[in-house]
Every structure is written in C-alpha cells, then in structure tokens.
C-alpha cells in the first residue's frame, strides 16, 4: 500500500507547496505578534480528504490532523493505519483531533481514535466522554487520557456549539468537571468567531475569556483559534493552535451531498 503514496507525486507536490506557504504565513504572523512560532501548533483539517492525504502530510512532518465528523474520522484513522502498514502501537504517528460538534452517541467510537477533542461544550458530554475514555483505557483500546479543549460561544448562540460565555459560571463549571474527571485532561479553550463578527473583535474577546479562565484553571494554557482566512489575527490574540483546512488541502474532494 505504501507504493500507492509514492505514485501520488503531483498531490505530494501540491501539499508540500501549500504547507510551506501556510508555515510561512504562520511564521510571519508570529513574528509580527512578537511570539515564537514554535509555541503555535499548525493543525491541518483533513475532513472530506482521503487517508492518502493524511499519509502525505505525515511524511511531510505533520504529526496531527483534525476531523469534524466522527464516523469519517474513525474510518479514516483505520485506513491510515492500514495504508502505512503500521501496528497498533505505531498508530500514534498521527494524532487525530476532533474539531466538530460531538454527538453523545459517538463518544464510544471517538474514545478509541481521538487524541484531542476541541469541542467539549456541556457537562453531559464531559460525563459521557469520561466514561467512554475510561472504558477504552481499561480495555487497552487507548493508552492516554483524552486531551480536551472547552469550546465557548461568544455570542451565546449554542446552536453552533460552545458553552454560552454570557451565562454566569457556565464555562467554569465545564472546565471544573473536566479537571475532576478521571480520563480527560483540560488543555484550554476553543472558539470560532460568531457569524457577522469582526475576527479581531472576536479573538480579543476570546483572549480575555481565556485569561479569566486561567486564573481558576492554570493548566488550561491552550487556545485553539483561527482558521485558513483569519489565523494571523488569532495568533495576534494568543492562539496556540490554528486549524487550517482549505489553505492547506484545497477545496474539499470527498464532500457528501
């Protein structure tokens, strides 16, 4: 199967060029913000792209990819492992991140393939994930706790995911439950600019909320913010993880109707 990757010279060239361009943008944004580019993770978003693209990204030095659909991610993680012919112990060569909204009926599957979840937004989801990850750990289906970002909703519209930041104590309650769990580890906060908001305004508000949360949860140092069109602004406001899809992989290839 590895030979199939070698035959994709054009695609590898595309991804190599795109990755260099995105890394250059990230380095420039870091320098402009007076930050070290090494403290900011570039997370390729591989949703709707094949496992062969993930294999190429891995060969180009990427160690994590993000997915937004649990079923697609589970299938792709298995395809990636088969494609490279790796053993179960070697599957960690790529860390799979869940960046989309998580349905509670998918947590058992997610607990087996996800290294990190960026979209934790309720006490019920924390409890369900804690149970599922604990079972996966006990059953030998994973080796480490699930890394967790708590997603916040800056405008209170929770239909798009996120804890309502305008509800007193809501964010702290979810963060506290993650910290009290047995199989989850709190990484930090994740946020997306609400529709119609100026990204600069949104990321500044996200930064302020992150600073507030850090006072009660000092280990929550991560800030997952910024995508293809606005990650430079997010870096200015303290993002430690930028989620880049289109600018890196191009228009989606596997989108289902």
Curated annotation (Swiss-Prot):
GO MF annotations for this entry?
A: pyridoxal phosphate binding
Residues bearing N6-(pyridoxal phosphate)lysine are 47
Q: Which InterPro entries match?
A: Ala_racemase_N, PLP-binding_barrel, PyrdxlP_homeostasis
- What are the coiled-coil residue ranges? none
Q: List the disulfide bonds.
A: none
Q: Which UniProt keywords apply?
A: Pyridoxal phosphate
What is this protein's function per UniProt? Answer: Pyridoxal 5'-phosphate (PLP)-binding protein, which is involved in PLP homeostasis.
Which family is this protein grouped under?
Belongs to the pyridoxal phosphate-binding protein YggS/PROSC family.
Official protein name in the record: Pyridoxal phosphate homeostasis protein
Q: What is the species of this protein?
A: Mycobacterium leprae (strain TN)
